Structures are given as C-alpha cells and as structure tokens.
Amino acid sequence: MRIIFLLIFLACAGLIGYALYLQLMDGLLPCPLCIFQRIAYWLIGITALFTFIHNPQSLGQHIYYGLIILFSLAGAIVAGRQAWLIRFPEAFECGISPEEAFLNGLPLAQWWPNMFEANGDCNDGTWQFLSLTLPDWSLLIFAAFGIIAGLLWHKKYNSINQ
C-alpha cells in the first residue's frame, strides 16, 4: 500500500513540473486560482511522501488520509471555480483580485516567483487536451487523489472494525 503514496507523490511532482513547463516554455502564465491549485498539489505530494517514508500505523494513517482528502477537496473546489469561470467568462471581474494581491504578497512568491507568483488570466481556457481545459483536468485529478485516499481510509477503517 505504501507504493500508492509514492505514486501520488510522483504524480504531483510531475503535474507541478508540467505546469512550470507550460509557464516557462509555452508562456501560459498562472492565475491566482492556478497558484492555489499548485499549492494543493504541493501539499498533497508532500503529505503522500511523508506517508510513504513514515509508513504510519493506524492513527497516523487516518491523519495522512484525512489530510490528502482535505487538500484534494480544496484543490477540487478551486479547480471547479476556475472551470466555471472559463465556461462563463461574463461572471469574471477584470483587474487585480484580492487573491492575486494576497498570493503575490506571500514570502513564497518572493522566494520562488516562477512557482508561486500569480500574473495570468483566470478565464484563459486556450490550453485543451481531449476538449478539457487545465482546470477540468485538475478537477479530475484532485477527485482521483481524494477518492484514492478515501478508499484507503475506508479499507483501513473496515479492517480495524472486523
């Protein structure tokens, strides 16, 4: 079961790496919602790596599974919001948002601006693969991570109660 968490960590690292590739090589600038999703991928990936390395017992597993579910849910909510904004651009407000000002003011944005500085347009849906935009794919991936952690948690809970 530990290998699943290594795979989740590697998937998160690959997704973050691909986001940086799109930003630096293709010029697709991240918006505030993209940065929040990157942070969620970081949190999921680090939690999965800790789970893999630590190999916790019962209580620790519940905590790690719960954190992955929480971070996946947060990422899915943000990705869903961005997917909605792309489909309904008239609901989008132009100008610097409070989220952008908040994110760009964080020490992380000063320390690693390529990763954490938001300067893109949230309703830019130009990148597509199989007719799905980046936030659509991100929503599916966050859902998958949450479902995997939920199933593992359920399996662990059932094995304890039997």
Curated annotation (Swiss-Prot):
<dbReference type="GO" id="GO:0009055">
    <property type="term" value="F:electron transfer activity"/>
</dbReference>
<feature type="transmembrane region" description="Helical">
    <location>
        <begin position="63"/>
        <end position="80"/>
    </location>
</feature>
<keyword id="KW-0997">Cell inner membrane</keyword>
<feature type="transmembrane region" description="Helical">
    <location>
        <begin position="137"/>
        <end position="155"/>
    </location>
</feature>
<comment type="function">
    <text>Required for disulfide bond formation in some periplasmic proteins. Acts by oxidizing the DsbA protein.</text>
</comment>
<feature type="topological domain" description="Cytoplasmic">
    <location>
        <begin position="57"/>
        <end position="62"/>
    </location>
</feature>
<feature type="disulfide bond" description="Redox-active">
    <location>
        <begin position="94"/>
        <end position="122"/>
    </location>
</feature>
<keyword id="KW-0813">Transport</keyword>
<keyword id="KW-1015">Disulfide bond</keyword>
<dbReference type="InterPro" id="IPR023380">
    <property type="entry name" value="DsbB-like_sf"/>
</dbReference>
<keyword id="KW-0143">Chaperone</keyword>
<dbReference type="GO" id="GO:0005886">
    <property type="term" value="C:plasma membrane"/>
</dbReference>
<keyword id="KW-0472">Membrane</keyword>
<dbReference type="InterPro" id="IPR022920">
    <property type="entry name" value="Disulphide_bond_form_DsbB"/>
</dbReference>
<keyword id="KW-0560">Oxidoreductase</keyword>
<dbReference type="Pfam" id="PF02600">
    <property type="entry name" value="DsbB"/>
</dbReference>
<keyword id="KW-0812">Transmembrane</keyword>
<feature type="disulfide bond" description="Redox-active">
    <location>
        <begin position="31"/>
        <end position="34"/>
    </location>
</feature>
<keyword id="KW-0676">Redox-active center</keyword>
<dbReference type="GO" id="GO:0006457">
    <property type="term" value="P:protein folding"/>
</dbReference>
<comment type="similarity">
    <text>Belongs to the DsbB family.</text>
</comment>
<feature type="topological domain" description="Periplasmic">
    <location>
        <begin position="81"/>
        <end position="136"/>
    </location>
</feature>
<keyword id="KW-0249">Electron transport</keyword>
<keyword id="KW-1003">Cell membrane</keyword>
<feature type="topological domain" description="Periplasmic">
    <location>
        <begin position="22"/>
        <end position="39"/>
    </location>
</feature>
<feature type="topological domain" description="Cytoplasmic">
    <location>
        <begin position="156"/>
        <end position="162"/>
    </location>
</feature>
<dbReference type="InterPro" id="IPR050183">
    <property type="entry name" value="DsbB"/>
</dbReference>
<feature type="transmembrane region" description="Helical">
    <location>
        <begin position="40"/>
        <end position="56"/>
    </location>
</feature>
<dbReference type="GO" id="GO:0015035">
    <property type="term" value="F:protein-disulfide reductase activity"/>
</dbReference>
<keyword id="KW-1133">Transmembrane helix</keyword>
<protein>
    <recommendedName>
        <fullName>Disulfide bond formation protein B</fullName>
    </recommendedName>
</protein>
<feature type="topological domain" description="Cytoplasmic">
    <location>
        <begin position="1"/>
        <end position="4"/>
    </location>
</feature>
<dbReference type="InterPro" id="IPR003752">
    <property type="entry name" value="DiS_bond_form_DsbB/BdbC"/>
</dbReference>
<feature type="transmembrane region" description="Helical">
    <location>
        <begin position="5"/>
        <end position="21"/>
    </location>
</feature>
